[in-house]
């Protein structure tokens, strides 16, 4: 029971009838296409030869031929629906009159005008309808509302910016005005303080002068009472008698009395001392204050110098300590390198692990030492 050739069951097998039919149809279509191409080539060649012949005729003096497309010059029936080729032939043959043709032409123009008016009326109606539709369009209303909201927001933002700018300007003016007021208040306070101080000094001076006047007045009355008591009157009379005998004339006596009165009216040394102390009382605290300020400044400068000196000494000590440590470490490195014959740290560590590590047993150490001892 044979199944035959299995390739015959494949769709691509060339011995199948349908594949052979498809190949035959493709070959026939190719042949037809080649025939059409050849015919088109012959037509093009004939047309080229014909054009060459016309060119030679025109060059020989023949009539020039106008190259144009005839169908573009064909006149359509544009004179109304009742006009056709037969009517045109009748006019050309003289069977129709010219006034009839003109009358028909006027009627056609009137009809065209009526048609244009109707179209314009339709256009007007369509414009009104369009406007009504636009008014009733919800999307357009939403768009207009959004534009209004956007415009409102822009106006609010502009108003807020203007208000902020005005508030800044107002704060600047108020700050400037307050600073001017503070300066004027400070100036007025200083002036008031100085005026109060001057008034106090004047008042103190007036009080001292009044006290001196009262004291001199009381002394004068006291002297007058003593003079009236009898003792001073007696001595004064004796002095006057001596003076009258001593002075030669009355003018010397008057001069002596006037000089004694002026001397009695002059202020006492105690009052002059108190007045001097009063005037020097205000100047003494200012001098003392300047002296205190200078002493504090000198003390601060001395403290700063001492602090800088102590800081410099500490830095020098730290630098010296660092240099000593570096020298000690460098010395240790040199000693270690000299001890291990200038071997690196890695090799030294490996040798330590090999010869003295925990992984090496006592027997391995004995064998290695024995091997080293037997080595010549």
Curated annotation (Swiss-Prot):
Region ranges (Disordered): 153-211, 258-289
TM ranges: none
Cellular compartments annotated: Nucleus
GO CC annotation: cytoplasm; Prp19 complex; U2-type spliceosomal complex
Top-level taxon in the UniProt lineage: Eukaryota
Record keywords, A-Z: Coiled coil, mRNA processing, mRNA splicing, Nucleus, Phosphoprotein, Spliceosome
GO BP, sorted A to Z: mRNA cis splicing, via spliceosome; mRNA splicing, via spliceosome
Compositionally biased intervals (Basic residues): 168-178
Keyword GTP-binding: no
Phosphoserine, modified sites: 266, 268
InterPro entries with a match to the protein in the record: CIR_N_dom, CWC25, CWC25_splicing_factor
Ranges in a coiled coil: 25-60, 286-334
Biased composition (Basic and acidic residues): 154-167, 179-199
Principal location class: nucleus
Protein family according to the UniProt entry: Belongs to the CWC25 family.
Protein's job: Involved in mRNA splicing.
Record text on subunit structure and interactions: Belongs to the 40S cdc5-associated complex (or cwf complex), a spliceosome sub-complex reminiscent of a late-stage spliceosome composed of the U2, U5 and U6 snRNAs and at least brr2, cdc5, cwf2/prp3, cwf3/syf1, cwf4/syf3, cwf5/ecm2, spp42/cwf6, cwf7/spf27, cwf8, cwf9, cwf10, cwf11, cwf12, prp45/cwf13, cwf14, cwf15, cwf16, cwf17, cwf18, cwf19, cwf20, cwf21, cwf22, cwf23, cwf24, cwf25, cwf26, cyp7/cwf27, cwf28, cwf29/ist3, lea1, msl1, prp5/cwf1, prp10, prp12/sap130, prp17, prp22, sap61, sap62, sap114, sap145, slu7, smb1, smd1, smd3, smf1, smg1 and syf2.
Name of this protein: Pre-mRNA-splicing factor cwf25
Organism for this UniProt entry: Schizosaccharomyces pombe (strain 972 / ATCC 24843)
């Amino acid at each position: 029971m044979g199944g035959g050739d299995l390739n015959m069951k494949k769709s691509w097998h060339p011995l199948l009838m349908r594949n052979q039919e498809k190949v035959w149809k493709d070959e026939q279509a190719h042949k037809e296409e080649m025939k059409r191409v050849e015919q088109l080539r012959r037509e093009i060649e004939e047309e080229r030869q014909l054009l060459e012949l016309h060119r030679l005729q025109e060059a020989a003096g023949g009539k020039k031929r106008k190259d144009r497309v005839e169908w573009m010059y064909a006149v359509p029936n544009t004179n109304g629906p009742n006009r056709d080729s037969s009517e045109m032939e009748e006019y050309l043959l003289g069977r129709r009159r010219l006034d009839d043709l003109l009358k028909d032409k006027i009627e056609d123009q009137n009809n065209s005008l009526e048609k244009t008016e109707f179209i314009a009326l339709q256009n007007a109606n369509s414009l009104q309808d369009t406007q009504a539709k636009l008014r009733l369009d919800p999307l357009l209303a939403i768009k207009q509302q959004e534009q209004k909201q956007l415009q409102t927001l822009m106006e609010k933002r502009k108003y807020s910016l203007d208000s902020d700018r005005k508030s800044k300007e107002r704060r600047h003016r108020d700050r400037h005005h307050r600073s001017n007021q503070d300066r004027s208040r400070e100036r007025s306070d200083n002036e008031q303080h100085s005026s109060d101080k001057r008034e106090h000094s004047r008042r103190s001076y007036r009080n001292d002068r009044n006290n001196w006047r009262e004291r001199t007045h009381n002394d004068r009355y006291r002297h007058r009472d003593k003079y009236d008591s009898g003792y001073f009157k007696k001595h004064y009379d004796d002095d006057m008698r001596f003076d009258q005998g001593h002075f030669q004339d009355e003018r010397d006596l008057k001069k002596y009395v006037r000089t004694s009165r002026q001397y009695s009216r002059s202020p006492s040394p105690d009052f002059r001392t108190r007045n001097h102390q009063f005037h020097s009382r205000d100047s003494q605290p200012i001098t003392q204050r300047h002296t205190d300020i200078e002493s504090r400044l000198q003390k601060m400068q001395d403290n700063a110098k001492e602090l800088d000196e102590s800081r410099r000494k500490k830095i020098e000590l730290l630098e010296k300590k660092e240099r000593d440590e570096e020298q000690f470490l460098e010395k240790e490195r040199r000693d270690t390198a000299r001890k291990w014959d200038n071997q690196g740290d890695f090799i030294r560590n490996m040798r330590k692990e090999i010869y003295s590590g925990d992984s090496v047993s006592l027997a391995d150490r004995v064998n290695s030492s024995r091997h080293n001892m037997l080595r010549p």
